Amino acid sequence: MDHSALLPTDTREIIEANCREATDNGYACICITPATLTWVMDYLRKTAHTSNVSAAIGFPHGTTTAEVKAYEAAQSCRMGANEIDMVMNINRAKNTDWDYVREEIQLVRQAMAAERQDALLKVIVETSLLTQEEKIKACETCIAAKADYIKTSTGFSQGGATVQDIRLFAGLADKRIKIKASGGIKTARQFLDMIEAGAQRVGTKFSLQILEGLTREYGIK
């Protein structure tokens, strides 16, 4: 479970409450914006808690340049993030400029590695905006660029993760890339559906609600 706190209205108090939830429940990471990253790192130092921290870059539309995304990623890693969730350049993807998309991901990957070799890169492709052919090409491009994860959605567009898209990516992955389902996942049943379809991680801001549902409805703790 990747727990997200990405709203532009999130105050420091809200971010710290989300950090507390993430550390108390052992989530895979907390995903925040670079602007709130200092609050997260301060909280973790102050409480002596540990958590993986992911910064969302080029968020939410992916429309900044490759160089800006690379700088954002490098700066976030310097500030303490050990994971990056970057938004693919959807304009370029829709224009079939897949070389640009691949090179952008590679540039971000290199910028991250210069700061910390162990950082994970997740690429958000915003599946609701892509055709089936574009989804396939996006997955192939993420694999070619050596991303660690392909991620379905930002949660800020017109649609979110679907079981069909997770199955599509799982069929293409062949152990070369992992899959993160994100966007619109609110219930225990949705969470289980995504995992069963092939996702290794699920991104949501409804993490505690899902955990409670897993225990109440399925006896999973």
Write out the residue ranges for each language-model feature.
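N-terminal beta-strand-loop-alpha-helix module at the start
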Residues: I32
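Metallocofactor- and cofactor-centric catalytic cores in central/energy metabolism, strongly enriched
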Residues: A28
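Alpha/beta enzyme core
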Residues: H3-N25, A35-I179, T187-G213, I220-K221
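Short hydrophobic "strand-cap" motifs at the C-terminus of beta-strands
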Residues: S182
